[in-house]
């Protein structure tokens, strides 16, 4: 059997023998393996090989962000809500209070979680909130005071870099801590 092309470069026969044996044991045809190998190789490259490059891009963007005084440390915050009306109401109050520059409302998510001793499943909507890191505590308190849930989700992730003009707009559209 000829070696399969891979985005990672040439592979030795030994390197491809184990996957071929596993595919044969699983009842997969060589044709199916040939079709899937480039996809698997690309996924492997993206998840492992490109990771270092992405990290360096992120680091350089972060360095650019820190080198200018026109931006502030920023975050993305996830908050789930039970329905569209609750999402619009909460998003509007967050923006009115200048606790965030933008809130995206993502409809149609399904959440599976542990609550009151059993697995629960609910249709929800997701708010994706872009704001200053320094406003997280005030935003969290606002969500807790204005949310229908006993324990609302408020999860913050750092923004490591991005479009500097957007990050400047984020800063200028939110209140100072």
Swiss-Prot record:
Domain of life: Eukaryota
GO BP: protein homotrimerization; response to metal ion
InterPro entries tied to this protein: Ion_tolerance_CutA, N-reg_PII-like_a/b, N-reg_PII/ATP_PRibTrfase_C
Pfam families registered for this protein in UniProt: CutA1
Annotated compartments: Plastid, Chloroplast
Primary site of residence: plastid
Keywords: Chloroplast, Plastid, Transit peptide
Protein name: Protein CutA 1, chloroplastic
Species of origin: Oryza sativa subsp. japonica
């Amino acid at each position: 059997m000829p070696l399969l092309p891979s985005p990672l470069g040439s592979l030795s026969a030994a390197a491809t023998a184990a996957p071929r044996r596993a595919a044969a044991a699983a009842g997969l045809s060589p044709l199916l393996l040939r079709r899937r190998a480039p996809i698997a190789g690309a996924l492997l490259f993206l998840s492992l090989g490109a990771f270092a490059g992405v990290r360096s891009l992120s680091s350089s963007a972060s360095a650019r962000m820190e080198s200018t005084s026109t931006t502030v440390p920023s975050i993305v915050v996830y908050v789930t809500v039970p329905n569209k009306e609750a999402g619009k109401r909460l998003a509007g109050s967050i923006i009115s209070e200048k606790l965030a520059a933008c809130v995206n409302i993502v409809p149609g998510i399904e959440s599976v979680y542990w609550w009151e001793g059993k697995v629960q499943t609910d249709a929800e909507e997701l708010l994706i909130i872009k704001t200053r890191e320094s406003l997280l505590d005030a935003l969290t308190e606002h969500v807790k005071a204005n949310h229908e849930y006993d324990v609302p989700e408020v999860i913050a992730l750092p923004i490591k870099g991005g479009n500097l003009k957007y990050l400047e707009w984020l800063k200028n559209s939110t209140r100072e801590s």
